[in-house]
């Protein structure tokens, strides 16, 4: 069975350590498109953080799709039409904000148009996220967030501080939300059952594809859900060792154009 859809993570996967798309990766993706394969970027970033990549990779044609916010938003790239759009409630936000203060970690909330923090001492990783995804930062008190459509919240801090906080997150939080670590300094909290896997499953069904016709390429824990639902899970050589245990294939590192290697070896 030939592969007809490839879901590709960005950071640590699609781009190299300099956050660049190598010529080899660009070429492989264009060849896959020419062969009729759907290449879908699937990322924890908001849409603003992938816009330039979609342009650079020429993934804005009719019938092209993008998965952002770790699966909370799925859109047609040519029109912006939303196929899936999930968000947290204001009560969810308040509970997360309260827990972050109790655990002593920075938190920010992300909408489709900005990053919001209730901490006047804005964390350096919030600034990093703002730069990475090309979104502005706004200071708002929790009371001023009631009218915002919050797609996800993130606990962000130094890895050792964040890891210590994760150990203290109540079990009921894992029952209420989708929680996954996307980087050593990022913990993402979304609506329950929202992840890259649910988004890719929905998209594959919409396109009439079988599991065997799908591939996902990733490197970190927030890629686990999509790697588990496709027939051909590929993990980067630089990926999380735990993630490699569920891989069908291990490709080269992101600095060795691993996405291109995967496409040319197992797809084309």
Show which residues each predicted segment covers:
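Asp-based phosphoryl-transfer active-site loop
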Residues: 4-18
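Mg2+-dependent phosphoryl-transfer enzymes with acidic/Ser/Thr/Gly-rich catalytic loops
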Residues: 1-5, 22, 188-268
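A generic "binding-loop/recognition-motif" signal
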Residues: 46, 70, 112-113, 185, ...
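Conserved acidic, metal-coordinating active-site core of Asp-based
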Residues: 99, 103-217, 238
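Short active-site oxyanion
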Residues: 36-40, 64, 152, 212-213, ...
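Short, structured coil segments at secondary-structure junctions
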Residues: 62, 70, 173-175, 229-230, ...
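Active-site phosphate-binding/coordination module
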Residues: 23-123
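Hydrophobic packing residues within well-ordered alpha-helices of enzyme cores
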Residues: 25, 50-54, 165, 169, ...
């Amino acid at each position: 069975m030939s592969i007809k859809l490839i879901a590709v993570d960005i950071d640590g996967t699609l781009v190299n350590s300099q956050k660049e798309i190598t010529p080899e990766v660009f070429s492989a993706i264009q060849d896959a498109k020419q062969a009729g394969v759907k290449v879908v970027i699937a990322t924890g970033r908001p849409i603003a953080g992938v816009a330039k990549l979609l342009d650079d990779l020429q993934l804005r044609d009719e019938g092209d799709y993008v998965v952002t916010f770790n699966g909370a938003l799925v859109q047609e790239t040519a029109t912006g039409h939303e196929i899936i759009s999930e968000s947290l409630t204001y009560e969810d936000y308040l509970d997360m904000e309260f827990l972050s203060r109790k655990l002593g970690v920075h938190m920010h909330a992300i909408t489709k148009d900005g990053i919001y923090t209730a901490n006047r001492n804005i964390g350096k990783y919030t600034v990093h996220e703002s730069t990475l995804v090309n979104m502005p930062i706004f200071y708002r008190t929790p009371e001023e967030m009631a009218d915002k459509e919050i797609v996800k919240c993130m606990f962000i801090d130094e890895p050792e501080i964040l890891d210590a906080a994760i150990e203290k997150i109540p079990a009921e939080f894992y029952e209420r939300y989708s929680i996954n670590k996307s980087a050593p300094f990022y913990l993402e909290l979304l609506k329950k059952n929202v992840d890259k896997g649910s988004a890719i499953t929905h998209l594959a069904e919409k396109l009439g594809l079988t599991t065997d016709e799908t591939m996902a390429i990733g490197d970190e824990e927030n890629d686990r859900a999509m790697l588990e639902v496709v027939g051909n899970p590929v993990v980067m050589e630089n990926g999380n060792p735990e993630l490699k245990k569920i891989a069908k294939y291990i490709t080269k590192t992101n600095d060795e154009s691993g996405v291109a290697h995967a496409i040319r070896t197992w797809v084309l």
